[in-house]
Amino acid sequence: MKLLAPSILAGDWWCIGEQIQATIRGGADILHYDVMDGHFVPNITAGYEILSHIRKRASLPIDAHLMIENPDKYIPKFVEAGANWISVHIENNYHIHRTLQLIKELGAKAGVVVNPGTSLSAIEEALYYADYVLLMSVNPGFSGQKFIERSIERLRILKEMRDRINPSCLIEIDGGIKENNIAEVVRAGADVVVVGSGIFGAKDIEAQTRKLKSLMLSAVSV
């Protein structure tokens, strides 16, 4: 199973509904929704109220990536707003097992996120409980950053850890994914690939989504 997740943070919010529909027609599997509070990361984005409006206009699962302080306080709000997947960072969560359990109890898939500068050993225990791991291939906070090449090796290491500890756990990657590297990250072990400007920066979003999904599937068959 290889899933493509357009990151709507990179879209044009004047016409985001139309752009989301274009990604759906192009074969997108999940919508990735970044949430930033200006404290954990140096940027501020939309919260659960905007997510609830997107939920009304999109049939795909919504993956809410919470880059915020005190995520446990807001997780119920995001689930209520329509998030189907919710991920939290290991870097600001001292009770990751409790947080993952909370997400699951609310009926959503529970994910743990690891930043580029954090050792993968930090999430080893969380792998036993997580439905997915989100590996950041840029430093979180802004769309359109350059892919960190070391992420390919980290993907391979993470896949080995996942296969040993919890084979059903999905591996997601986010940051700097374009046409030139999407096949490589899939071959290295990514099950879910988040793409922002690599989709929404195209003139024809539907065609670009379809092209990237084809590249992912071709990488699996090689």
UniProtKB/Swiss-Prot annotation:
NCBIfam families: PRK05581.1-4, rpe. A divalent metal cation binds at H32, D34, H65, D174. Its cofactor is a divalent metal cation. Its EC number is 5.1.3.1. GO terms for molecular function: D-ribulose-phosphate 3-epimerase activity; metal ion binding. This is Ribulose-phosphate 3-epimerase. Belongs to the ribulose-phosphate 3-epimerase family.
